[in-house]
Amino acid sequence: MGNAFNVRWQRLAGTDANIRYYNLPADITYFFQGAPQDTSALYVISSPDELAEIKGYLDTSNPNVRIYASSRSNAASNTPEYYAKMNGVQFSDIPFFKQSDSSQYQKVAGSTGGEFQLMRLYAMGSDAWLLINHFNELRQVPGYTLSGLTGQLSADSNCDVDRDMTWYQVQDGNVVAVAN
């Protein structure tokens, strides 16, 4: 995953990403010791508990560093108290979670016990079905896109599927979608 992130970063920024791996959230403290003072952001792949620990450290030592996280940190078990501590954190996840009032969301949440990992799996299966039923259009019509439960879906000339996810931000303890 680090290599794919760096390749994309190089395309967008023209420089290498400063990628570091950690085993424990406490290891993050060492990354910022001796790091360039212009470090402005951190992208983490972590559990909610690990993210809370990392956020706590950065709030006291590097409060200007913006935190971006993967969907792994977004769990159904996250409490209002958790979100109150996560103010400013942005994370990517599927747009299906914006549709919590829809009947489809309610049905899936009910059958999965509201477990986000299972709901993501359902969304991937739904999108696979959508892609199968629109394969010819994806293959033959340049720029053709589909609105799936996991994001905007498109395919390149090799039929490699690309997906744009939704970004969310915690603002005053509430999770809100960020305009892409």
What is each stretch, according to the model?
Residues 11-18, 36-39, 55-126, 136, ...:
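Extracellular/periplasmic periplasmic-binding protein-like sensory domains
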Residues 32, 41, 55-57, 153-155:
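Generic recognition of flexible, low-complexity loop/linker segments
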Residues 1-50:
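Extracellular/periplasmic Venus flytrap/periplasmic-binding protein
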Residues 110-179:
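Segments of small-molecule ligand-sensing domains
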Residues 46, 69-72, 93, 169-171, ...:
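Active-site proximal loops enriched in glycine and acidic residues that flank catalytic Cys/His/Asp
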Residues 23-27, 73, 95, 173:
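Short, solvent-exposed coil/turn elements at secondary-structure transition points
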